Amino acid sequence: MRLTTSVLLWAATSVLQADATQTYRSPTGPEAYGAYPPRYTVSYTTITSTSTIHSCPPRTTTIFTSSPPPDDGCKFPGCPNQPPKPGSDVHCDIYCWAKGCSLCKNDTCPEQGGIYKRREDMKNIFGRSTGSAEGYNYTPETTCCCCCEPGGGKHTVTVTKTKTETKTETASITKIITDYVTKTVLIPTTVLEPTTIIDPTTVPTTVPTTIPTTVYNETTIHDSTTVSTTVIQPTTISDTTTLTTTFTTVVPTYITTTTFGTVTSVVTVMVPTTITSTYVSTMYTTLPGTTLTTSVTVPGPTVTPPPVTLPPETKIITLPASTVTKVTTLPASTMTVTSTLPASTITQSGTTVTLPGSTTVITSTIPASTITQTYTEPGTVSTVTSTPPPETHVITLPGSTITKVTTLPGTIMTVTQTLPASTVTQSGTTVTIPASTTVITTTLPASTITQTLTEPGKEITVTKTNTVTTTTTSFSISLCPTRTANPTYTPLAPLPSNYIWGCPPGQLCRPKRTPADGQCNFEVGLPSQNFVCSPDECIPSPPRHPPQKWTPGKVEKWVVSPGYFNIDPRKFGLTFDIFSFENVTATSQGYFRRSLSALFKRGPEIVAGECYDECDSAATEAEAVGADPTLCKPDSLFMKLVGQCKKCTNDRSNGTYSDFDTVLFPEFQKWLDYCDTLPIPSGPTTRPEPGMTSSTTSSPTHSTVITSMTSMTTSESSTSMRSSSTATTSETSSTESSRTSSESSTESSTDSSTTERTRTTSTAESTETTEPTSTDASTESTSTATHSSTGSDPESTNTRHPSSTASGSTTTRGGGGGHGSSSSEGPVPTSMGTATTTGGGSIPGSGTGIPPSSSTDPVPFPGGAGSLSPSTWGKVVTCISSMALLVAFI
């Protein structure tokens, strides 16, 4: 009996102990798996290079150079060692030099290069060796005349010269820029200790990284040069003039008809006699006048008009894109990573072992690296002004036909007709009549003769003077620093929620240039969500370029709308040479600085470049409208463009290109977050889903906790989990995230989903409940004091933001959008379906994504139990053992 009882007791104890060793899966993240952390330590260092475009200077003329002050002991600006004396030229010279100017010569300044004259009152200038607290005051009449230009010192100004000449100018600029050298240093450290630790231990890790290096990139942008050339082009204009001359000549025509008749009379007498008569008749007939038309060709005259001056012609010559090469050599740097592990207590069966705290110092020396930056500048637009030579135009007129009508007077035509002699036989006698002549005169009326003469064409020579003006405009891009914070303005009170970058709807932020910006002329990407403009920097939204649409599958030129921020083309794998500028005026001397920490960031993931037109159009539309309710309407242009941008990028996301949420969601987050604050209309809402912010509770959906390794970042604090003396250090950039909560997401493969959003208010806190309906999984998610939504396919337009369905995790995409207690500016990269971040760090995992939907068991963490609840068989065995114990006890 005792043996049976002991066996049953042992079996029950084993089952209970096996169930008790199973770890509870906390909804806050993978801290519950503290008993089974990975057994290695990995340290990551990200090196990212940035670049500055340099352009070669053109021919310049130095028109003003401020000379250094005399060496009289004054070695610092604005404060001579001795008190200045009123009217002293020496001290005025020092004073002007300290102001970055030069002393006026004869009270005048050069009138070139923007140099202006100002008078400075010498007041309150302390004598350095006097110790006076009041200083030396002078009357307003004690002034110094200084010739100043912004910046002071020696200034080089490009003077625009115009000259007239006949020439053909071909300009070609070739520049080579090499950019982005990424160097990754991996320092694997493995500490093995055959000890099993039951309790998780949080190890604060401090990674001191000091890189006191500042890289200054000089960029010089030169003014345009206008060359006017007068070209005289001879032009020959051929003209043909037809002259018709009508001559009327009256030609009288006389027709004389003469009739000659011979009459022979035959008289018959008693004796038959033969009489022969011959008649000759002459008839004169006057015919009417006739009109004769004669065509005469007369050679055309040559007309030479005066010279004609044609208006100037402007030819625009677009030069091909140029490439600039810049090589920056960085010195070697040493990075020391110190991980301090506190004392830990190890509990084993029967014994308690307390391990002292350990400190691991990892020193890594990064050798000097050479960063070659390649940028392709957009082709320069060259406009050449030239005056062509006088043009001589010879105009040859066609042959002219001159019709001359000549009217002839009436003519007299004489017709003589001779009749043969006739014989008349009379009986008895023969009488012969001599021949007679009859003259008939006819007078014809006057006739008109028309003659048409065709003259040959004549040549007219016209000399035309053409003035062709070609303007060569050389434009270079000088990148401005990223707008993260405004050093010149801080609002006194919180701004309304519909203010974007400190400006109300309908207005756009245009930051003023600061000395730190130098003479930059192009903003790199959109400002940070925390950037605030002062009220005087808010301007009405300027007009934009007409809508632009690229040919599908091609990358073309993108015309920049002045005053608007454009998405960084490098996020699309493009360069700045896609930009085209209309009516640009180049500035002089671009200068900005980049810290070395920015150079050590890895380049961001990119999306397909052919989607830039749709995405940038959505950004400029949002900038023009602002945070206004009309922007958030489902049929608004902004929502349509965002949907097209997201569809284009997600359809092309593969191993080479990333998706919308990973790269572009932070660009649109500020406007989408504003739309989320508007009242929710009744019924389903159709909107694009460009981003995600959700918090879900435990559900039947199972997920595998893995870690995205797509980007490596750096942080000054992290949380490690320790098992068998295996220290894990995960470093996350503090600029990317400042959260301490765990983040996990599971992407949904549902092609379409319907989200119904309701708000529930309780006495303790505000709760949003989202009830998703999809074809793959049915989950109920609830978030407390955070935004909650259910994710769907990128093409779904039912909700504003895509979300993820996770098991007991909190997922924030793009820094949380201001919800909850976490804040971030960048997106949280995900990989293999789920991204998990714990305590600001990143722990590499071995998960392979979401298990098939047919899976019924939870995916176990390596070395951990599946769940806290005992299995069915365990319950049965425990129940039987308990009953046996009870019977044995009785």
From Swiss-Prot:
PANTHER family linked: GLYCOPROTEIN X (PTHR38122:SF1)
UniProt-annotated location(s): Secreted; Cell membrane; Secreted, Cell wall
Removed propeptide positions: 865-890
GO biological process, one term: cell adhesion
Signal peptide region: 1-20
Main location: secreted
Glycosylated sites: N106, N217, N583, N654
Biased composition (Gly residues): 838-848
Name of the protein: Agglutinin-like protein ARB_02240
Organism: Arthroderma benhamiae (strain ATCC MYA-4681 / CBS 112371)
Function according to Swiss-Prot or TrEMBL: Cell surface adhesion protein which mediates cell agglutination and host tissue adherence.
Domain of life of the source: Eukaryota
Lipid attachment site numbers (GPI-anchor amidated glycine): G864
